[in-house]
Amino acid sequence: MALRSIKSIAGSCLCSRQRRCGSSAAIFPEGIFRCLSPKFGQEFPE
């Protein structure tokens, strides 16, 4: 469930939809990636 994923990674970094966030990333309806790992704690501009 997308909602469960959002809750589980709340506060994680946001990544550009064109960038890879690492091995663990979830695609959201907005079309952005949210990194699941805190070590990818950077934001990439579009």
Curated annotation (Swiss-Prot):
Cellular location(s): Nucleus; Cytoplasm
GO MF annotation, one: histone binding
Chain ranges passing through the membrane: none
Database matches in InterPro entries: SEHBP
GO cellular component, one term: cytoplasm
Pfam name, any one: SEHBP
GO biological process: regulation of transcription by RNA polymerase II
Keywords, in A-Z order: Cytoplasm, Nucleus, Transcription, Transcription regulation
Entry function: Plays a role in transcription regulation.
Protein name in UniProt: Transcriptional regulator SEHBP
